[in-house]
Amino acid sequence: MRRWRIEDSAELYNINGWGLKYFSINDKGHVAVTPREGNASVDLKELMDELQVRDVTSPVLVRFPDILDNRIEKISKCFEQAAEEYGYTAQNFIIYPIKVNQMRPVVEEIIGHGKKFNLGLEAGSKPELHAVIAVNTDSDSLIICNGYKDESYIELALLAQKMGKRIFL
């Protein structure tokens, strides 16, 4: 039987299928994350080992806000380049569908970093709209209402509009 190689880890984790430039296999064969290009990588196995030493038990949720920030910047830059190439001059907005990840720290990071990129939020249901109204404190930010709109959903959207939110039904 042959020795385990780094390539075996890359294949096992299918790192090339989903890791982009953020996740890789390091020289120890461990999954590593580089949240921001040019910055240091974090060995996730070593991180978990260190957490165990500190009596932190798994499962552990590890967030990488720099990856979120970088993806927002990338989307904005790509659209900017395409707009320039095709002579598109209208204002544009990046819209984050809250159903992708509704966790407050994630949404707050996206809103906070996305402010300078005209980032708005999309709600496809009344519970999502409640969440969006609660976290979206910037009156300039868009709120897009998608999905089935019953009377109470429309009433909530109109109430949010009266509160100064920029709502699109």
State where each predicted segment sits.
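Low-complexity, highly charged intrinsically disordered N-terminal segments
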Residues: 25-39, 44-102
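A short linear-motif detector with a strong N-terminal bias
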Residues: 1-4, 10-12, 40, 73-75, ...
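Residue-level detector of functional hotspots within protein domains
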Residues: 8-11, 17, 80, 84-86, ...
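Generic serine detector
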Residues: 9, 24, 41, 58, ...
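A general structural signal for short secondary-structure junctions and capping/turn motifs
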Residues: 12-15, 21-24, 49-52, 134-136, ...
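N-terminal basic/disordered segments at the start of proteins
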Residues: 1-40
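Active-site-proximal beta-alpha core segment in soluble small-molecule metabolic enzymes
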Residues: 87-169
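Short acidic/polar alpha-helix capping motifs at helix-coil junctions
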Residues: 12-14, 70, 143
